[in-house]
Structures are given as C-alpha cells and as structure tokens.
UniProtKB/Swiss-Prot annotation:
Membrane disposition: Multi-pass membrane protein
Protein name: Uncharacterized protein MJ0971
One GO location term (cellular component): plasma membrane
One function term, GO molecular function aspect: metalloendopeptidase activity
Domain of life of the source: Archaea
Organism phylogeny: Archaea, Methanobacteriati, Methanobacteriota, Methanomada group, Methanococci
GO biological process: membrane protein intracellular domain proteolysis
InterPro entries: MBTPS2, PDZ, PDZ_sf, Peptidase_M50
Localization per Swiss-Prot or TrEMBL: Cell membrane
Pfam families given in the database record: PDZ_2 (PF13180), Peptidase_M50 (PF02163)
UniProt keyword terms in alphabetical order: Cell membrane, Membrane, Transmembrane, Transmembrane helix
Family classification: To S.solfataricus C04034.
Regions crossing the membrane: 3-23, 60-80, 100-120, 141-161, 171-191, 280-300
PANTHER family, per the entry: MEMBRANE-BOUND TRANSCRIPTION FACTOR SITE-2 PROTEASE (PTHR13325:SF3), PROTEASE M50 MEMBRANE-BOUND TRANSCRIPTION FACTOR SITE 2 PROTEASE (PTHR13325)
Length: 365
C-alpha cells in the first residue's frame, strides 16, 4: 500500500483511539502515556474453559519442552550470528529493523495487521488452554493497543502459575510457540494453493528490457502462446527465462490485446513485476504474512530470556530430564541444571536483550 493509505489508516486509528479514550472507564481500558492501552475483556474465556478441560494438553505440553529447547537453541545461535554479520557489514542493516518499522513499506497494512492478530491471538489462546488443563486459573483476556491499532492479545494467568512446578510452567509456556508452529505448518499448503487461484496479473513495475514496450497497469494475457491465469503460471514461466532469448508477450491495455516480442537481458530477466487483483492479493498477502509472523513469533519466544516463553521452557528442561527413569538421562538432567537454572538464565536474559537492542540501534544509526 502507498503512503496515502498509511495516512488514512493512521487517521482512522487516531479517531478510534480518541473515542475509546473518552469512554475508557466504562469499558475497562487502562491507558499508558496517552498512546498505549490494555483493554481487558472476557473474550475467549469460554473457549479456554471448554477446551482446557481435556488433560491431553498436559501431555502435549510436557512433550513439547525438549522440542522447544532445541528450536530455541538454534534461534539463539541465529541471533548471535546475525549480530556478528551485521557488525561486520556482511548483513544489510535493514535485516535488523523491528517488524513494526516495516509496515506500510514492506508489509501491507491490512493483511499485515490481520496476520499479526492471528499469530498473537492463537499464541495467547494456547497459553490459556494449557494453563486451564493444569488447573491454573485464567483471570482475564484482552487486547493491547497502540493508539487505535491492535498490537496483539493476552491472557492473564492466576498467581498459581508463579508457584507451580517448573515442569508445569514450562509446559504452559511451550503452548504459545507450539500453536504458532502449527499455524505456520498449516499455512504452507494454503500459501501454495493461493498462488494457483485464477486471477488477472497487472504489471505494477517495469524495467529494462520490457520498459520499452510494456507499461504499469498492463494486464499479462499470454506468454509464448500459454495463457497466464495465476501467479503460479507466472512463477513457472519466470523459472524458464534464459539470457538473450526472445519472448512473445500478449497484454491487455485499454480493452485491446497487444503483442510484443521482448529479448531478455544478459542476466535472464525481462524486468516485469506483477500483482494479482485486490481481493486475491489480500488473500495471498494475509496467508503469506500469517506464515511468516507465526514462524517468527514462535522462534523468537523460545529464546531463553525473560519475559519470553523460552525462559520457563529452558528452566523446566533439566527438571524434566531428572525425573526420567533412565539413570543416564536423569544424570544428564542433573548436570544441565548446573548450567541451566534461573540464575544463569537471568544472565543469558541480559545477553540476549543487549544483543537484540544493540543490533536494532545499530541498524537505525
């Protein structure tokens, strides 16, 4: 979306925020700094009550702990590697920018917000369901707001969570990332399917060598005698482009079909960028960013740092191994507990946030 759309969304968000702010006492909205808000609701509590009665979630949560630790370990290595490459100049600074700064330019507003809400809502709902299965009270749920824009959702657990066994806390903490990973995996076939949806493909950007013949707004009709009906058709064609080869392209312009013969560049490119119709683009972009946000939210939350889920998951791992009947595994758990405990994880927390914040600040310098 262009800058004008971003301005419209911002204006609408501010108007909504002014209305919410004026009635904040009656709707149980707590505000911070005049721009942030926490809106506590009962939204989702019935679903949590209904699904949380099944004890199967307890077993799934316990099994998820070692899986989440492994994924979190690789995420930690990736964060450190990215920071080193960022400082050495082998990674562009844009790669370290926070997601919020990418909205409007890289991430389309509407699909991006929908995808982010799906990721965070599923994440928090899973925490609530797993907590309920362990008999821990879910006090409330709610929405986090920045001006009038929803940043995400949350569930507020009872005080029993703080005093619960490490293993239980780890199982509940693993629920959110696990739910995000499931949505991530589910979105893969959906994304593949979305590329096959029948749609017109409009040229949104054109460069050499195609710019001599084609214009923005032209609709791709046919390439080398093959009708282009979907993004998948165009992607498959793009894979076959060879350097310095002639391609016959038919386009629709002003209700007329025009035919051009274009020779590809030395790099094997035609210089055409296309986009599907608005409704199809909205669907594809929503699935695409749902895919990415769930993947990133899952792995980021598994870092061994407070207040992320990974802190409780990692803290529970040695305890889980110690309780195994196998003497060797139990001994490994005892040894790991010397290195993975609340004290060492507190130090790792400082390291993780210093690396992340340092990388972000460096990328904006």
């Amino acid at each position: 979306m262009n800058m004008d759309t971003s301005k419209v969304i911002l204006i609408v968000a501010i108007i909504i925020w002014i209305i919410l702010y004026s009635i904040r006492d009656s709707i149980n909205l707590k505000t911070y700094g005049g721009i942030f808000g926490i809106l506590r609701t009962k939204l989702g509590l019935k679903t949590i009550e209904k699904l949380g009665k099944y004890k199967i979630w307890q077993k799934i949560g316990i099994i998820s702990i070692p899986i989440c630790v492994i994924l979190g370990f690789f995420m930690l290595l990736n964060i450190i590697d990215m920071s080193i490459r960022l400082l050495s100049g082998t990674l562009p600074k844009e790669a370290a920018k926070p997601v919020v700064f990418l909205f409007g330019d890289v991430i389309p507003w509407i699909p991006g917000i929908i995808a982010l809400l799906i990721a965070i809502s599923v994440h928090e709902l899973a925490h609530g369901i797993f907590a309920k299965s362990f008999g821990i009270k879910v006090k409330s749920s709610g929405i986090l707001l920045l001006l009038g824009l929803p940043l995400g959702a949350f569930v507020e657990l009872g005080d029993e969570f703080k005093t619960a066994d490490k293993k239980i806390r780890g199982a509940i903490a693993s629920a959110g990332p696990l739910a995000n990973l499931i949505i991530f995996l589910t979105s893969i076939p959906l994304l593949s399917f979305s590329y096959t949806l029948p749609t017109e493909l409009k040229i949104i950007d054109v460069k050499e060598p195609a710019s001599e013949f084609l214009q923005k707004g032209d609709i791709i009709y046919e390439i080398n005698g093959k009708k282009i009906n979907s993004l998948e058709d165009f992607k498959e064609f793009a894979k076959t482009i060879e350097p310095k080869k002639e391609y016959e392209i038919k386009i629709l312009r002003d209700n007329k079909i025009l035919t051009y013969k274009i020779v590809s560049s030395n790099e094997g490119k035609l210089g055409i960028m296309v986009s599907p119709t608005k409704n199809t683009a909205l669907f594809i972009n929503t699935i695409y960013w749902t895919y990415w946000f769930n993947f990133l939210l899952a792995l980021f939350n598994l870092l061994p740092a407070m207040p992320l889920d990974g802190f409780h998951v990692w803290n529970a791992f040695p305890e889980l191994l110690k309780e195994r009947k196998n003497r060797f595994i139990s001994k490994v758990g005892q040894i790991l507990e010397l290195f993975i405990n609340e004290k060492t994880l507190g130090s790792i927390t400082l390291l993780v946030w210093w690396v992340i914040l340092g990388s972000i600040l460096y990328s904006m310098w």
